[in-house]
Amino acid sequence: MSLHSYQVAQNTTETPRQTEYRLFAQVTRALMECQKESANSSLSKAIHWNRRLWLALQADCSQDHNVLPEATRAGIISLAIWVDKHSRKVLRGEAKIEPLIDVNRSIMDGLSA
């Protein structure tokens, strides 16, 4: 069976919420691995992946057709902006990675509720 077949099977059995949870779990795991190692390339990759995730959420929440309540959308957009700013500080060595992990875990808690 090809990789595409597995992806199709996975997409048909997961709800959008489960897909979002899985993606947050993968990104958060990558961020947590960076705490254990001191490799800058791993840190840069994990931070970039996390920023892309949040940028996608921000873009989706900016769309008029998004069905989330306006206050929720505004909160996600605010978090995405914070994630971007904090990520830059982490990459410059001016901040720790833990707050990014904590925010992602909070989102995961909400998705699993």
Q: For the regions a protein language model found, what residue spans apply to each?
A:
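N-terminal intrinsically disordered, cationic/polar leader segments
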Residues: M1-L55, S62-H65, A74-A113
